[in-house]
Design a protein with these regions (language model features):
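Cysteine-dependent hydrolase recognition
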Residues: 23-482
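Boundary at the C-terminal end of the N-terminal hydrophobic targeting segment
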Residues: 17-22
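Sec-dependent N-terminal signal peptides
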Residues: 4-13
């Protein structure tokens, strides 16, 4: 089928977005802090963004100085928020804010874990930031991905998938259709992908491959496949012949740049991240602010999000807590290591900096990923998969936690830091100090489990069939992976 068919197919599609009411998450009202950059507060338009969040969640507004984010710690320790949202113009939304925010929010109390679900609201302009704040919940039922194959779109209402390993292939599934159609895209996959974005609204965009703050290569390691770039806040597709096509996809979506270097770094007003927010419809975006080689945060957040258990913001936050758990199992001394926030950091420089402290590739990768992966958007906005995609239903009632397996789920046969993702549970309220997780009927705390004021981690092993139910309680005790 010729690539021109793609244009005719997508031209017939009416714009739509999948919007649904939010399901159970901790209530953000009254436990939300809006942290507004002091310089940004001088703009009336940006002040309106912060005010909208305050009104939405009965939030507390605090101002911070971009030169020292940690300066708001006394206020955070007093308020003990469940959610923290940093509001800033893009000129001050760079890597230093991402790193300092992550490090600051681990210091609200005395355990080594993050103490609030957080995000950064920014954009090419204040209107983009306001769209992050004011929009409806999103129920993710359509997808676009750069990692496609012939079965990628099965189970999705509609979407499209390019293949970063093949210049000539792309798959399209139109709204209302049950069939996936393969499209020939060579020699201009960039134009074909731009046309798909213009014609088919999707809720979820996920990518890998080469990227920087200023471009994304469509076909891995093959410049002839073209790229996406930005110009004056707009996304543009560029072919290898320097032909241009506008990438315009304004419907609200979440973008997870799971395997891309640098595309999550807002290094100024005009960059790839702000272009996705401005003309690409990204009201939430997750991505690396550095080169990525280990991938725990990117692929882990994607996996947790796609489990259906969590919103995108919860997946970002909880995957980071799993990473901190893994660091604690490998080398607790690394919990005190802080990546420099104010200087440009390459992997080589980081390796030299960590000589004598890092012993393994896992320790290096986990420490590198810990504070360098960003979440942009309102952290309390519900962006999640529909109930039918959930693999485990998690219920919390007082000190009791129940896991109901809705599908067959397999975990590694033994606890391993790189492959084990404990089941993460957001708690309704902070449990008493000195408590641990116990399996139903168990007399000893569950090995390697964690309980904090915000969440619990329950490591599981082996296969768990659909229909199985597991029950746990939180009561006095201390596990081998205690928060201390």
């Amino acid at each position: 089928m010729k690539k021109t068919l793609l244009v005719s197919l997508v031209a017939a599609v009416a714009a739509s977005s999948a919007v649904a009411g939010a399901r159970r998450s901790p209530d953000p009202v009254g436990c939300y802090v809006v942290a507004l950059d002091g310089e940004t507060a001088k703009s009336a338009d940006w002040q309106k963004v912060a005010d909208a969040l305050v009104a939405k969640y009965s939030a507390k507004l605090v101002n911070y100085d971009a030169s020292s984010v940690e300066g708001i710690l006394p206020e955070l320790r007093k308020l003990k928020p469940r959610y923290v949202c940093f509001v800033t113009a893009p000129e001050r939304a760079g890597r230093s804010l991402v790193v300092e925010a992550a490090q600051t929010l681990r210091k609200i109390d005395d355990d080594p874990y993050g103490d609030a679900i957080w995000g950064i609201v920014t954009g090419y302009n204040a209107d983009d930031a306001m769209r992050m704040v004011e929009g409806d919940p999103i129920e993710v039922e359509s997808i676009a991905t750069s990692m496609g194959g012939s079965r990628t779109l099965d189970g999705w209402k509609h979407g499209f998938a390019s293949d970063e390993g093949n210049m000539g292939r792309m798959w399209v599934k139109l709204p209302g259709s049950t069939n996936t159609v393969e499209i020939a895209t060579s020699p201009n996959p960039a134009k074909s992908l731009a046309a798909a974005f213009r014609g088919i609204p999707v809720d979820y965009w996920v990518t890998s491959g080469h990227a920087t703050e200023h471009d994304w290569q469509i076909i891995y390691n093959k410049p002839k496949g073209g790229c996406f770039v930005h110009k004056n806040g707009r996304l543009v597709a560029v072919t290898s012949q320097n032909d241009y096509a506008l990438v315009f996809s304004p419907n609200p979506k979440v973008y997870i740049a799971a395997g891309n270097c640098l595309i999550g770094h807002v290094d100024g007003k005009d960059c790839m991240a702000t272009a996705w927010m401005h003309t690409g419809g990204a009201v939430q975006m997750l991505g690396y602010t550095v080169e990525t080689f280990y991938g725990f945060m990117g692929w882990g957040a994607k996996s947790m999000f796609e489990s259906g258990r969590y919103t995108a913001a919860e997946a970002f936050y909880l995957n980071n807590q799993v990473l901190l758990w893994a660091i604690g199992k490998l080398n607790k001394d690394l919990r005190d290591v802080e990546i420099p926030a104010k200087e440009k950091l390459s992997t080589r420089k980081f390796i030299r900096m960590m000589q004598g402290r890092i012993r393994t590739q896992d320790e290096l990768g986990l420490t590198w990923d810990r504070d360098t992966f960003a979440f942009y958007g309102d952290p309390a906005r519900s962006v999640r998969f529909p109930e039918k995609r959930k693999d485990i239903d998690i219920k919390v009632s007082g000190d009791k936690i129940t896991l109901d397996f809705l599908r067959d789920v397999s975990f590694p046969d033994k606890i391993e830091v790189k492959s084990t993702r404990p089941v993460a549970v957001l708690l309704d309220k902070a449990p008493a100090r000195g408590t641990a997780i116990f399996a139903e009927g168990g007399e000893e705390p569950l090995a390697d489990s964690v309980v904090t004021d915000v969440f619990a981690l329950i490591p599981l092993t082996g296969k768990h069939p659909k229909g199985e139910k597991l029950a746990f309680t939180i009561r006095p005790g201390e596990s081998s992976a205690a928060a201390k």
